[in-house]
Amino acid sequence: MSPEQARDTLVSTVEETSTVLDVSGWAWTGAPEVGNCGDRPGERANDNYGYSAPPQSRDFAADAQKVAEHWKSLGMEVRVVDSPSVVVYATGGPVEGLSFSTGPGNYYIFGTSLCVPGDASELRKKDNG
């Protein structure tokens, strides 16, 4: 998988996750951000990406369960934490990891792409034109 494919998979997985909730107003918290991963900088890279929206529901546990079930359907290992706020964590599947947080104030979906061959510095230069 190329770095671009890993990034695109991350973005589509995060944004697709938002569609399982009855929530409008989702917006990215910034462009996908490339960085080094693994133990040899310059040889492997991954991206981080976040998406947020104001919650329309107050049933945070039910929304978290919807996200957890969706991620399980993608073949991910899922863990739900309910204190101090409800957070869903997932690893595996099409990305390295994802989290869904219900607070404070906004819903957040954050993810990290798979670690793939590539130089983060060169990828950053390419992304910035």
PLM features per residue range, with description:
Residues 1-43, 54-55, 61:
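N-terminal leader/targeting segments
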Residues 43-49, 122-126:
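Extracellular/mature segments of secreted proteins
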Residues 6-13, 27-28, 112-113, 118-129:
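C-terminal basic regulatory modules in eukaryotic proteins
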Residues 46-53, 111:
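Oligomerization/assembly interface segments of phage tail-like spikes and tubes
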Residues 29-36, 86, 90, 128:
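A sequence-level detector of short, solvent-exposed, charge-rich linear segments
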Residues 55-120:
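Extracytosolic low-complexity repeat regions of secreted or lipid-anchored proteins
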Residues 37-47, 92-96:
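A short, glycine/Asx- and small/polar-enriched loop/turn
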